């Protein structure tokens, strides 16, 4: 240790002592002197030890401790969990968010992105932290895999306060097993809460954390709610809401304010608004839609078109920083589940006064555009108005009119809209926007809330017509704000990172495909690549691969453009009922029109981060619910046979997506056939050593449902037949009929199963019909040697 630090006169050596004496009657060591001493030490020092070295008396100790805490608050020092102090500048400290993995390790993701990337946290570092916590991390070298390791020095903020999970007793101790597998440590429950609520083993409960985990001590929680049995109707949504911490109850202040909102447009609301009541604006939405954000109208004006997009004027009723706004900002988005919606706004606004319902007056913000015959927006203007929707139309209804040429009261306007859509669509293709044709599914429920069937949802031109109208208005909103130099949240979507681009090119090369553009591909290059996918069996999977190479779209207060849509500037203007960024864009546009400036209650940057996070959170919750429902649906299908295609390959097996219902499951590598099967990442396939049989992405297969486990949300299949192989293809077996065909649900004998498993050896197996149409020879069984490995 430095001799100066050992000196008994350390306090007297403080170069700022005279200043401190002028400020305080009983001066303490100055902040500068404390920092200098800590920097000389180079290692964290206990507060008690530092106090002794600085001759802090017993009466001064509490004030000295307060000074250190104030310095920590100001970022000058760090006080870690063990009560030791160190100079912040001496440590290369990084504030991070913990992203835990179900297997016990995790990552510390810097809050401010770094070129070096994330830190890996091994199990020892993860013992005292939980998924989502904000922590201070110090770099701790490079691990064997070349990744940066981190050491958690301090927990700045805990993310988890309530945890949803299953109740169990373990050797007399009440345990909460979190539903979120990233919370991989069991939580001990207080006995009093258990005695009060009396949950049954396996029931879903909510616990409030009373004591957070430490290195050698588990977290402790008390039960605050018993939700019920795991398989109860609607339980999947209750779990997702709590697992993802979705705000689902409006505050009392919000509910009280919402009641004061009128249910009709008043005369005083019309001041300064254009009257569009006679303009035949119509809404076009899905059959089940209840809130209507947007209405459209188009007419031919000379060689050009006039396009009017009227959007619900939510900003008139939800004022900055009022109680409704506070709840809306916290939620940031409506969350859509099958059979349930968690709205951003109270229902009397979202489905009432703000919704553009037919035949009633509603306030709106209008984007009034002139679009040339070439698809360019020649001019536009924004203004507040009052409107009256002339019809509530549906996508299927409009598409039927367009495709069948059926006469209807709105035929002239719909025909004009469709002609304009074709022009805008042509412009979109010329621009190089990436066109993704994804297939969505809809779950049909019975009266008991159980899935009756899953049906594909086909997007028709009526969907695309409205989409193009909304895109046009959103582009105008971004342009308007940029031209008037008003800060707002833009919707930014960047192209691929160098790492993701390299991965994509490698994968495409294995499939004989190419992406142009070199190190900086443009949207047009991506659009050209998408054209190469058309007609391929694996087209849908290639689209997913292409999507994953791009970065996530986010909300930011600076404009970076939208790569996927090929726009230089883009903002969200058209859905203020269900998206908070759209509401802020409305406020910013109104501010410009009124020659004012709109500033939110938190920084634009922080608001962008928050709304982007809430969007991802809602998506994650929706996926959880959908996966749970699909797994539940497949429980009754165990033993049945379905057809599908290989959607993924890994070292433990192949993933298969079933036709029509788009449910994914795993065929374990040990169930692929009587051979040694190896994962070949360089060709994105699994291949048999002896047979040469190969399973490629996009290959057609038939599978039997073997397991559907709600606890882990996994569905397992057993391979029945399929086509792939380097030597020849095996057609789908006559016995491998999809569910609904003859023999549905019948179990095969052991001998039949054995024969089925042999089906991938040298193209032989399941009494299969070869390419010639002749029955294949009886296969020669070869014993399986199962490979070790986790699925």
Model-found features: residue ranges?
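Conserved, carboxylate-rich catalytic/transport cores that coordinate ions
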Residues: 158, 162-791
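Charged, low-complexity terminal tails
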Residues: 1-191, 674, 681-684
């Amino acid at each position: 240790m430095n001799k100066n630090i050992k000196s008994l006169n350390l306090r007297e050596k403080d170069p700022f002592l005279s200043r401190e004496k002028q400020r305080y009657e009983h001066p303490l060591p100055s902040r500068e002197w404390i920092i200098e001493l800590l920097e000389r030490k180079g290692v964290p020092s206990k507060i008690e030890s530092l106090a002794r070295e600085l001759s802090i008396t017993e009466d001064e100790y509490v004030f000295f401790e307060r000074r250190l805490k104030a310095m920590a608050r100001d970022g000058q020092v760090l006080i870690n969990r063990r009560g030791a102090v160190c100079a912040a500048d001496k440590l290369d400290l990084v504030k991070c968010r913990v992203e835990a993995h179900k297997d016990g390790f995790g990552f510390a993701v810097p809050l401010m992105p770094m070129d070096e990337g994330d830190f890996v946290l091994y199990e020892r570092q993860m013992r005292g932290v939980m998924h989502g916590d904000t922590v201070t991390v110090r770099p701790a070298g490079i691990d064997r895999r070349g990744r940066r390791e981190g050491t958690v020095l301090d927990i700045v903020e805990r993310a988890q306060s309530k945890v949803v999970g299953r109740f169990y007793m373990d050797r007399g101790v009440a345990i909460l097993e979190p539903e979120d597998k990233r919370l991989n440590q069991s939580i001990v429950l207080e006995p009093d809460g258990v005695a009060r609520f009396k949950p049954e083993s396996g029931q879903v409960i909510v616990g409030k954390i009373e004591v957070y985990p430490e290195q050698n001590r588990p977290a402790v929680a008390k039960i605050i709610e018993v939700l019920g049995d795991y398989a109860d109707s609607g339980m999947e949504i209750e779990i997702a809401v709590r697992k993802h911490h979705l705000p689902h109850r409006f505050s009392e202040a919000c509910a009280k304010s919402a009641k004061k909102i009128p249910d009709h447009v008043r005369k005083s609301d019309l001041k300064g608004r254009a009257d569009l009541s006679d303009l035949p604006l119509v809404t076009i939405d899905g059959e089940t839609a209840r809130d209507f954000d947007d209405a459209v109208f188009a007419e031919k004006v000379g060689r050009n078109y006039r396009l009017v997009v009227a959007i619900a004027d939510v900003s008139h009723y939800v004022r900055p920083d009022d109680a409704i706004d506070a709840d809306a900002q916290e939620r940031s988005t409506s969350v859509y589940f099958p059979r349930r919606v968690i709205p951003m706004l109270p229902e009397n606004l979202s489905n009432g006064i703000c919704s553009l319902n037919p035949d009633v007056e509603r306030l709106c913000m209008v984007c009034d555009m002139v679009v040339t015959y070439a698809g360019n927006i020649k001019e536009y203007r924004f203004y507040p108005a009052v409107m009256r929707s002339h019809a509530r139309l549906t996508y299927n209804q409009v598409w039927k009119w367009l495709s069948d040429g059926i006469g209807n009261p709105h035929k002239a306007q719909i025909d004009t809209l469709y002609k304009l859509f074709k022009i805008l669509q042509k412009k979109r293709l010329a621009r190089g926007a990436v066109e993704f044709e994804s297939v969505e599914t809809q779950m049909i429920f019975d009266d008991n809330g159980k899935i009756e069937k899953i049906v594909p949802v086909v997007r028709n031109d009526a969907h695309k017509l409205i989409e193009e109208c909304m895109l046009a208005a959103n582009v105008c909103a971004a342009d308007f704000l940029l031209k008037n130099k008003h800060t707002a949240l833009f919707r930014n979507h960047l192209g691929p990172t160098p790492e993701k681009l390299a991965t994509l090119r490698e994968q495409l090369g294995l499939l004989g495909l190419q992406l142009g553009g070199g190190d900086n591909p443009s949207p047009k290059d991506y659009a050209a690549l998408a054209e190469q996918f058309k007609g391929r069996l694996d087209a849908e999977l290639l689209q997913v691969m292409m999507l994953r190479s791009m970065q996530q779209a986010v909300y930011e207060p600076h404009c970076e453009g939208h790569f996927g849509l090929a726009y230089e500037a883009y903002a969200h203007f058209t859905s203020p009922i269900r998206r908070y960024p759209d509401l802020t864009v409305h406020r910013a546009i109104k501010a410009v029109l009124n020659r004012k400036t709109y500033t939110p209650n938190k920084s634009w940057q922080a608001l962008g981060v928050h709304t982007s996070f809430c969007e991802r959170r809602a998506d994650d919750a929706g996926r959880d619910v959908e996966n749970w429902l699909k797994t539940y649906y497949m429980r009754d299908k165990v033993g049945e046979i379905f057809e599908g295609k290989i959607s993924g390959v890994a070292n433990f097996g192949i993933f298969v997506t079933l036709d029509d219902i788009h449910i994914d499951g795993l065929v374990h590598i040990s169930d692929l056939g009587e051979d040694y099967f190896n994962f070949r990442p360089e060709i994105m396939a699994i291949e048999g050593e002896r047979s040469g049989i190969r399973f490629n992405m996009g290959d057609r297969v038939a599978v039997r449902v073997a397991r559907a486990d709600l606890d882990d949300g996994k569905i397992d299949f057993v391979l029945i037949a399929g086509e792939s192989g380097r030597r020849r293809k095996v057609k789908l077996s006559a016995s491998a009929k999809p569910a609904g065909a003859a023999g549905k649900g019948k179990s095969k004998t052991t001998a039949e199963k054995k024969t089925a498993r042999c089906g991938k050896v040298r193209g032989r197996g399941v009494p299969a019909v070869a390419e010639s149409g002749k029955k294949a020879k009886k296969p020669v069984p070869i014993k399986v040697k199962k490979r070790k490995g986790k699925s």
